[in-house]
Amino acid sequence: MATRGGAGVAMAVWSLLSARAVTAFLLLFLPRFLQAQTFSFPFQQPEKCDNNQYFDISALSCVPCGANQRQDARGTSCVCLPGFQMISNNGGPAIICKKCPENMKGVTEDGWNCISCPSDLTAEGKCHCPIGHILVERDINGTLLSQATCELCDGNENSFMVVNALGDRCVRCEPTFVNTSRSCACSEPNILTGGLCFSSTGNFPLRRISAARYGEVGMSLTSEWFAKYLQSSAAACWVYANLTSCQALGNMCVMNMNSYDFATFDACGLFQFIFENTAGLSTVHSISFWRQNLPWLFYGDQLGLAPQVLSSTSLPTNFSFKGENQNTKLKFVAASYDIRGNFLKWQTLEGGVLQLCPDTETRLNAAYSFGTTYQQNCEIPISKILIDFPTPIFYDVYLEYTDENQHQYILAVPVLNLNLQHNKIFVNQDSNSGKWLLTRRIFLVDAVSGRENDLGTQPRVIRVATQISLSVHLVPNTINGNIYPPLITIAYSDIDIKDANSQSVKVSFSVTYEMDHGEAHVQTDIALGVLGGLAVLASLLKTAGWKRRIGSPMIDLQTVVKFLVYYAGDLANVFFIITVGTGLYWLIFFKAQKSVSVLLPMPIQEERFVTYVGCAFALKALQFLHKLISQITIDVFFIDWERPKGKVLKAVEGEGGVRSATVPVSIWRTYFVANEWNEIQTVRKINSLFQVLTVLFFLEVVGFKNLALMDSSSSLSRNPPSYIAPYSCILRYAVSAALWLAIGIIQVVFFAVFYERFIEDKIRQFVDLCSMSNISVFLLSHKCFGYYIHGRSVHGHADTNMEEMNMNLKREAENLCSQRGLVPNTDGQTFEIAISNQMRQHYDRIHETLIRKNGPARLLSSSASTFEQSIKAYHMMNKFLGSFIDHVHKEMDYFIKDKLLLERILGMEFMEPMEKSIFYNDEGYSFSSVLYYGNEATLLIFDLLFFCVVDLACQNFILASFLTYLQQEIFRYIRNTVGQKNLASKTLVDQRFLI
């Protein structure tokens, strides 16, 4: 290997500087330099260097060659021009050339001497021989011939020739042999290592160099590669500033996870020693961490340095999803090196350079589409890894960009190696970024350093990059899509090779996008606090209204429980509003933005949102069950206004005679009204099956589910061969909720505007049926509050034939009879009622007798059967409620009034029915609140939340649709069945007639 020019002068300067002085200098001035410098520089490639320039593999830029020199074949060094011989060569461009005399225009193959050629010269100015001839330039002992002949190689001074590996020519021996021993032999006390010869003194401090390869617990071993090449690479880098050796030393440090321990002199320890003792050399591109001749491996080891690197300088490139200036491509490039430190090439990361999992090129390249969250996981056989990666390739990753003057630059991409140990501590696994040590160079697979004793055998251990994550952080408050330098987080795993054909390893590659969501969290907390406070007030008002409706002024345990139930419902609405609002915000602003200003929360940040959705569902379920229980326990009674039409003769059993009796009133009208009431108990303003199927159609068939993908596209369709990004829980919830609400609201509007008006309105039809049947409905949803449907026929009776019925309808249509309202000359048939305690007590006394048919027989009169007692109680209740409506009981009278607007808004009554009950005119059919019909908002939101919770848990819209419809039918069945039993119990209608 060769040496760098001026090495002797550099070593003289370095010897004057102590390690402590250098360290103090760095600690004093490095923070100031860091604040002033940037980590970007011009992007240059080897093929763009001029013929008289070479590509400096350390500085990654084109550097001029010396006099009488040109670029070599690889472009990374210099050679003499044709007709010039080398008189000095220490590696790289540091060579000296001298023109050959006229009588010896040819140059030897090694370029060190001039020679007379027996025939023509090649383009390189060397002798040319016919096919089948061997060019011999020196005699057998190495003496240069005036004309090419075959001679023995001469290893003495002035020749220093040895036989090459192929044995077909004599070549000059390795320069370190000449410099160290002035011969081609490396005899004691000199040290022969890695094919190089070094002096036994003056290279490194007298400390034992460790060839240990650090790994996971219990996986450390002595690497044959380190044992063979570590010392030689370090010595060549230190003594001769050899660029390739310095790169090879850096590679060994990277293979050792960039870990170093002050107690040992391992690969990174040697690198740090050279770095600290070359402080007198200039930096590369004004980057203080990048020393001339050395690779850039570290960002320094000062606490708090990592956050500055990651957030001090933003990329001037603007990223946008849409518009004329659309820019959604992250242009990553990498300088690649082989294990021996040779520069291979510049290459883009497209095509799966850093992705071990195989896939199509389109899907692999999707990882670098800005705004697309990327996840790739697979399991790879160890045997395939050993075949595909016999030696590691090392990458220095950069992000390419163009400034405002259209000049190309590259920005260094820092690396967070989770396996890095600093003094045996995994500092990069700490949650505090201030303790991180950022690095630069990475590799994917190392199957070399894990070989023991022989490099030709199968490795005992291989090291694989099992987790690679590229995170892009958006600059806060940006409106132009500016980002900070991306961060590569990488984790390696050591695999102990036992049977390569049966072993495998799981690997993953991901790209995530982050932004500071602190402000969003604060705003969410503020909204939750404000709306939660309003929910408390609303719940207090509902509780106060409930207390009035049950006629109890005392605050007891039941009151507290009721308040908590009301608060659960209101708080569910708060969580629902916040989650839907948050979801729609991210859906609209992320998918519709042009210049990028917001990025989606990461999955771990979505946990809080999912918790809110879960709370909304749990609380809404409690509210739904509370309403369900309230509906199936209401008091209801059908008041039959029909009166007997006359008397008939009736035989008296046991007396052998007859007597006159009133004509009994038919019960069929009551049964009919009861059946209609039973049918409308679960009538809704939407069609549940249509709702579920329509939502599913838009999600799965139309493709609205694609809006929930974590990418920048707002298209409803995706190309199957292309990469499909993972779903965002927030976007998935937002799309589902928006569709469910939109379709539900459309159904409700259609139901109210068209269906009820032109086709069928079951609620109003029920009120009309009551009038035609001459039956009123008395409902008590609370102890002292309920509803009254006035169904008293304006014709006096309803138990008639078809002809008379049609005649009555005709008279009513022609306004030839009075109006149906409770108050004369009005149409008001529905009322909200607040009854007095005295009225309720009287009702309860009769009702207690009515329900005694379910009690023990010993409590009943011995002279009457249970059935007769119930019939008697039924007629008593019918008579009492009829007389109450007719103002017969002055001590239990009532008056009719309109509700105040504020009373309607607050849902409570300001007046207490102390002596008289109060009937409030109700044109809105409020009695539907004891039915499904009047609670559509609660049912719609409950179904929506159920659908979303199932989907978030299973990530399956089809399953969520099926389970949602199933629960709707289950609760509908429960409501029908239990409500029917309650109706039969409270009205004495035999359940067998409720069909």
Curated annotation (Swiss-Prot):
S-S bonds: C49-C62, C65-C78, C80-C97, C100-C114, C117-C127, C129-C150, C153-C170, C173-C184, C186-C197, C237-C246, C253-C268, C357-C378
Intramembrane segment ranges: 671-679, 680-688, 689-701, 732-757, 758-762, 763-771, 927-929, 930-936, 937-952
InterPro entries: Growth_fac_rcpt_cys_sf, Meckelin
Main location: membrane
Effect noted on mutating I833T: In COACH1 and JBTS6; found in a patient with Joubert syndrome that also carries mutation 1329-R--S-1332 Del in KIF7
Tissue-wise expression: Widely expressed in adult and fetal tissues. Expressed at higher level in spinal cord.
Effect after changing G786E: In MKS3; decreased function in non-canonical Wnt signaling activation; when expressed in TMEM67-null cells does not induce ROR2 phosphorylation upon stimulation by WNT5A
Annotated phenotype, changing M252T: In MKS3, JBTS6 and COACH1; loss of interaction with WNT5A
Pfam families in UniProt: Meckelin (PF09773)
Effect ascribed to mutating Y513C: In JBTS6, MKS3 and COACH1
GO annotation, cellular component aspect: centrosome; ciliary membrane; ciliary transition zone; cytoplasmic vesicle membrane; endoplasmic reticulum membrane; MKS complex
Name of the protein this chain belongs to: Meckelin
Organism: Homo sapiens (Human)
Highest classification ranks of the organism: Eukaryota, Metazoa, Chordata, Craniata, Vertebrata
Name of the encoding gene: TMEM67
